[in-house]
Structure formats: C-alpha cells, structure tokens
Amino acid sequence: MATTKSVLVLIFMILATTSSTFATLGEMVTVLSIDGGGIKGIIPGIILEFLEGQLQKMDNNADARLADYFDVIGGTSTGGLLTAMITTPNENNRPFAAAKDIVPFYFQHGPHIFNSSTGQFFGPKYDGKYLMQVLQEKLGETRVHQALTEVAISSFDIKTNKPVIFTKSNLARSPELDAKMSDICYSTAAAPTYFPPHYFATNTSNGDKYEFNLVDGAVATVADPALLSVSVATRRAEEDPAFASIRSLNYKQLLLLSLGTGTNSEFDKTHTAQETAKWGALQWMLVIQQMTEAASSYMTDYYLSTVFQDLHSQNNYLRVQENALTGTTTKADDASEANMELLVQVGENLLKKPVSKDNPETYEEALKRFAKLLSDRKKFRANKASY
C-alpha cells in the first residue's frame, strides 16, 4: 500500500511541477462527480439543490444552473441520470431540470422504476420498461453532442468486455459514441440482477452500424466516478482551445466536487471472520458486490485526498458522503415513500455535519466556499471573454 501511494503521489507531483502556470488565478477547471446508488441518488440531489441555490443567490440569477459552472459533470448509474438531467438542454437551450427538480423526480418515478411486480422469478428483479419510458419522455432524441457542458457517463459492454465512456470530447475520434442520452442513462443504470442489459446501435463515421450491449457503469468505473471525471477534465484541458493556457493540467487549478450516495454504518450489516468461515459461493455472492463497491469508493477518495493534500491543494477537493446509513436507507431500490423521506433527512442532516474529524467545517460551509469559487471563476471567464 505504501509503495502504491508513493508512486501515485510522485506521478501527480511530476505532472503538477512540470505543467504550465495558469495565466491567472481565476482560470480553473471545475469538475462535478456523482456516484451511483439507485434511489439513494436523493442524497446528492439534496446537496445539488443546496449548491445551485447558493450560486443563484451569489450571482443574483434565479436561472443559474450547475451546468453553467462546471466544465465536466460525470456520473455513474443514478449519478449518470443526474448528470443527464442537469446537462440536457430543453427547447430554450437551458438544462431541462433544475437541481430542485431532482428529488421530486425520484418521488414521482422511483416507485414505478423499482416496482417488484414487473420483475421475473428467473431474471432481473425489475423489467426496466418504466425506466426506459420515462427516460425517453424526459430526454427525447437528445444526443451526447448537445449536452450543455462536457459529460462523462460510464457503462460496460458485455460483448466486447470493455468499458464505454460517453463524453463530448471523444466524439471526433469515435462518432459512434454520439448516442441518445436516454440510451446512455438506461445503460449506466442497468445494474446486473436489477435491470436487463441494454442493446442499441449507432453509426460510425463510415455509416456502418455500431452495436452496444451495455450494463451498469459501476462495473466499469466502480460506484465513484471521480477519477474518470478528472481524466476527462485533463483531456479537455489539453485539447480545448478555451484552455490554451493550461495544456498540462495543474492540480492546484482543478476544483473537484465529488458527491456520494451514502455507505453503511461501520457496524451495520458487517460480518466477522468466524461468521463467514464456512460461507459458500452463494452467500459470498450476496455481499461481495457491496463490499467491493464500498472498498473501491473509499480508495478513490483516499487517493484523491492524498494527491490534493500532498500538492497543498486540499481545499480544491471536497468529497460529500454520508458514512452511517442504516436500515432501509442502505438499499438502492427501496422506493417506498417512507424510505425516500428518510433519504431526504439524511441529505439535509449531512449538510450540518463536519467534513471530517480533522475538519470542523460543515458540509454546508464547505459548499458555500465552493460556490464562491465557482461564482468567481465564472465571472472571471465572462470578463475575460468581453475583452
């Protein structure tokens, strides 16, 4: 572990020290990353509503939207759905959903998406038909290239056995990735055992048919897509003319907000070595995915925290995560009204909690600080463009 950490830190330090200096302090690359977690997407929904509200107040603009402030918005599974909601344009070329619309969306559609009566005894728990229907209604024919800012939505192709990352910046090289947002959102949410895999086809630059056979993005990038989102931001900084002064991304000029959907309490549904000593394949299968996702999410946060701290840029990274979910709130598919109300409470209470044991700043205070940085950076860009 120590060797891995040292190598990772060394790589990022080399990147940072050899990268060009930003022309001005206000020129930052801003990234929003949203975890997967099914109905638990209500938790980041609460956080996003608070952040967007702060931006509207600071800029005295009720029409301000998150897509106006972030260069890259990435998500996996339910996080991919939220990414699409806040970046897909409406008829006025503004995001079709404000952050305040996210939680009502879950309350209205969650019980139908996670309706166990639609599943089969042998097969996925849910048939996915309502999910696909509502995605088509909300997102229409909109494709990746129309997103109002750069996006990074992951999925996994079970035929090619490779991850598939949908971004605007990849379209010049891979035009077949310019898929409908409805197809992408279903694919990134199609968790094995919960929803059927998704098949659809697009066209290559030669007009040939290109087929996708996709499942949940968490299979490709784990539940926390922060590292994926950062890599997309790095590529944009290298290729986008708007970032000509920062061809090599300096982490001191990267602003990263990563939103989780909650993890179990340390003592909730854990197991001892004695208890599991005689477990077989079936018993392990029931818990191994949860363990793997929790560990991967923790390590992603650990690596990012280490890098930002060692580069003296710890204030540029904020991970908002509830680590003490219990009972029904731990379930990704409990869309009962009672549980959704509990998830709202989790999100609202999270805002009042300290960021960490070593940092007494509350998440609410940290998000206000982030909002100020986002607002100032947007104003800087606007002023620069006017000259």
Curated annotation (Swiss-Prot):
<comment type="function">
    <text>Probable lipolytic acyl hydrolase (LAH), an activity which is thought to be involved in the response of tubers to pathogens.</text>
</comment>
<feature type="signal peptide">
    <location>
        <begin position="1"/>
        <end position="23"/>
    </location>
</feature>
<keyword id="KW-0611">Plant defense</keyword>
<keyword id="KW-0325">Glycoprotein</keyword>
<keyword id="KW-0442">Lipid degradation</keyword>
<dbReference type="GO" id="GO:0047372">
    <property type="term" value="F:monoacylglycerol lipase activity"/>
</dbReference>
<keyword id="KW-0926">Vacuole</keyword>
<feature type="domain" description="PNPLA">
    <location>
        <begin position="32"/>
        <end position="230"/>
    </location>
</feature>
<dbReference type="GO" id="GO:0045735">
    <property type="term" value="F:nutrient reservoir activity"/>
</dbReference>
<feature type="short sequence motif" description="GXGXXG">
    <location>
        <begin position="36"/>
        <end position="41"/>
    </location>
</feature>
<dbReference type="GO" id="GO:0016042">
    <property type="term" value="P:lipid catabolic process"/>
</dbReference>
<feature type="active site" description="Proton acceptor">
    <location>
        <position position="216"/>
    </location>
</feature>
<dbReference type="InterPro" id="IPR002641">
    <property type="entry name" value="PNPLA_dom"/>
</dbReference>
<feature type="glycosylation site" description="N-linked (GlcNAc...) asparagine">
    <location>
        <position position="203"/>
    </location>
</feature>
<dbReference type="InterPro" id="IPR016035">
    <property type="entry name" value="Acyl_Trfase/lysoPLipase"/>
</dbReference>
<keyword id="KW-0758">Storage protein</keyword>
<dbReference type="Pfam" id="PF01734">
    <property type="entry name" value="Patatin"/>
</dbReference>
<comment type="similarity">
    <text>Belongs to the patatin family.</text>
</comment>
<dbReference type="GO" id="GO:0004620">
    <property type="term" value="F:phospholipase activity"/>
</dbReference>
<keyword id="KW-0732">Signal</keyword>
<feature type="short sequence motif" description="GXSXG">
    <location>
        <begin position="75"/>
        <end position="79"/>
    </location>
</feature>
<protein>
    <recommendedName>
        <fullName>Patatin-03</fullName>
        <ecNumber>3.1.1.-</ecNumber>
    </recommendedName>
</protein>
<feature type="active site" description="Nucleophile">
    <location>
        <position position="77"/>
    </location>
</feature>
<feature type="glycosylation site" description="N-linked (GlcNAc...) asparagine">
    <location>
        <position position="115"/>
    </location>
</feature>
<dbReference type="GO" id="GO:0006952">
    <property type="term" value="P:defense response"/>
</dbReference>
<keyword id="KW-0378">Hydrolase</keyword>
<dbReference type="GO" id="GO:0005773">
    <property type="term" value="C:vacuole"/>
</dbReference>
<keyword id="KW-0443">Lipid metabolism</keyword>
<feature type="short sequence motif" description="DGA/G">
    <location>
        <begin position="216"/>
        <end position="218"/>
    </location>
</feature>
